[in-house]
Structures are given as structure tokens and as C-alpha cells.
Amino acid sequence: MASFSILSIFKIGVGPSSSHTIGPMEAGARFCGLLKGILEQVMRIQITLHGSLALTGKGHLSDEAVLIGLHGIYANELELTTKKALLHEALENKVLKLANQHCIHFDYSKDLIFDNKPLARHQNALILKAFNAKNEVLKEETYYSVGGGFVYTEKELDNLSEEGENESVAYDFSSAKELLELCQKHQKNIAEIVRLREDALKNRPDAMMAKIYHAMLECYDNGANSKEKYLPGSLRVTRLAPSIKTRLEKHPTSGKDPLALIDYISLYARAIAEENASGGKVVTAPTNGACAVVPSVLLYAKNHLFENLSQKAINDFLLTSAAIGYLYKKNASLSGAEAGCQAEIGVASSMAAGGLACLCQASTQQVLIASEIAMEHHLGLTCDPVGGLVQIPCIERNVLGAIKAISASKLALEDEYKPKVSLDEVIATMYATGKDMNEKYKETSLGGLAKTLKC
């Protein structure tokens, strides 16, 4: 397998979920690639969503996502007008245009199966099969959407287990301890180490982070200025970001309230999280469900903490955040279906805390402390989306995740702070806690608020 890029912790895609929307879309597009040379023989496609993909798939738009993917389209390429046209053809006219070349009949009620039983390898699995005119299987593949928009086949997972994701990558690290040692050895900060690593892989870290930053800004602008009153779905959740923005423009917060800046953090986080919930274009950070934490903390820093924050400083924030996210992906999980919301909002808060500490000229040790503090106070957080939608409690958790990140960063900068828990230890604890967590609380909508709140 190709060496893993830390930059891929951030992906431009569409809402509402990285594992349940972006992942299935990629699986569908990749399956189209397997049909090259036999496409004209395909008469029918069967899609089976397993586990969490089945249980929350309709609310997370997993069903629509895989259909779009089967047209050969990836999430970063999708336009809203294209999405509407393709889904109308597939769902209303029952025509699926495989790889955007070969039209077949598609019956949603028969060809798309929701199987609540998870497969052994991961809670988010889907099986795609292509049949010929004799109803014989031409091609079959199982895909696992493991969180953050990352998708693997059975063989790819086996290779990961046997070989690891990276072989002899310069400046690579597998733990926070190794990262700290690298920084000390080369007298570099975390962002600089990530630059060196990605340069060795022939990537363009600064150009990529600038692109990611502008996509985050666009997402915020779209959410803050939306004319839609309600988010899609049965809950009819009101979009609050536009009204918060209007209020703050008319009545800016004064110095009388020392916590008034929280209103701006709420605006930034809600705008982005609401845009994600509406199916808009977003950036995984590290997931869609937690996509607002990192950018809202960055906007807080840019608009309220520092004057004239340079693009390099913004890139440093994002590269540092990505390095922290990489540690969680490598040693734990980014999937709410595998480890609960601690693996999404918790990781995002940990990433943002580290990024903010970096901007505040913290030492590498202090950056890692900030990231540890933020995760420590998300341990055990369940993933229980009401109605299978990425709205309640997801949107407000983004707000609180950002506030915790800022608090964690400030605490880590205290000269006398001496941590008892390391980042590596809290990452291991998060993963173990997630594995011990009852399946009802891991993105199934079978427990917690999802069960208590009737919709």
C-alpha cells in the first residue's frame, strides 16, 4: 500500500458523515473501477449495508452516497445539482448509470439491503455485487468505512495488519513519545516535522493546508449566511448560526462579560456543523460529525487572539492538528461506530487544542499536554445520534468540543502544570473505553438520546 499521508486527516467532501457518507461514496466509485472491462455485462447491482451503516444509514445518507459513488463520483467532486439529478434518476426513474457510462435498472426496495448485523472486521461495512443477465456474480467486494472517510477492502486491512501503513518513511512516528523525540532530535516543532515527512513523500503540505483552510472558510460562510430555516430531516432543527451572526453584527459583545467570546465560538462551530448536517461541502477534521471543532478554534484564534495571522501560522495550526489526529488513527479510532463520540468530537478537540497551543508558541511537550487534556475530558462520550441524523446532539457537541479545546490549550501553557497522564496513555485509554462500550452507544441510534427522544 502507498504510504499514509498525514495530510489526509483533512479531506474535502460532503456532509453529513465521513464514515457513512464520504466512505460509502468512495466504495461505490472504487467498485466502478473494478468493473472496467466488464461494465457492459453488468445487468444488476446489489448493495448491502451492514451494522451501523444500516442502522443509521438513511439519516446519514449512506444509501444515497453509495448510489452517487456508483456513478464514478467521489465526494470531493460532487456538485449539488449533479447530486439531485443522479438521485432523481436512480430513485424515481430507477435508472443507475454505472461509472457514468452504462445504464442499468435499479430497484431501491430490492437492490439496496439494510442488514443491521455488523461484519466481524468493523461495524461499518458494505458489500457490493455486480450480476450479469444470467444473475451470476461478475464481481463482489466488501468495503470497510473505518472513520474519517478512510475506506479499506478486506485485503487492504490484512496488509495494514501485517505491514503497517508506512515502511521506512522519513520523519515518521508511531506515538506521541516518538514525535517528541523527533522534535527534540531535529530541533523542530511538530508542524515542521510534518512538513519534512510529507515533503519526503512528494506531497505539498503548505499548498494542501491552504486549500483546506479556504474550504473551511467557505463552509463557515455558507452556514453562517444560509437562508434555510430548518435542517433537513424529521427533527426540523432550526439553523441558529445565521441569527447568531445577525445578533453579533448588530450588538457586538462588550467587555462587561468576560465569557462573551463564547458567542463567537458558538457561531463558528454551529455554522460549520449545520452546513455539514445539511449535506453541504465540508472538511473532515478528522470526521464530518466533528468537522466544526478544529476550524472554529482556528477562527477564534484568527479573529480574536492574534492580529494578522499569516498563512504560514494557519498552516502550522493545521499541520499540528493533523499530526495529533494521525496518532489517534494509527493507535485508536476515528469512528463513532467503533469507539463512540470520544473518537470523533474527542479527537477533534484534542487536535484543536494542540493546534492552538502551537499558535501560542508552546513547546512540543505543551502541545502534547494540551491534546491530552482535551481528550481526557471526552473519555466515555457516546455516539447516539437522534433519528440517525448528524444533528442532535452532534451540532452542540462541536461547540462544546471547541470550548474545551481552548480551555485545554490555556491550561497546558501554565508553567507549573505537570501532567500525570501522557497523550499516548489517553489515546490507549480512549480506544479501550470504546471497545468496552455497549454497541447501543456506538452510532446505532439504539440507545442514549436516540432512544429517549422520540422523533
Residue ranges of each PLM-predicted region?
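An N-terminal structural lobe/cap that precedes and organizes the functional/catalytic core
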Residues: M1-I12
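Conserved phosphate/anionic-ligand binding catalytic regions in large, soluble enzymes, centered on
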Residues: F10-G28, S278-V297, C341-S349
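C-terminal regulatory domains involved in ligand/effector binding and gene-expression control
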Residues: G72-T253
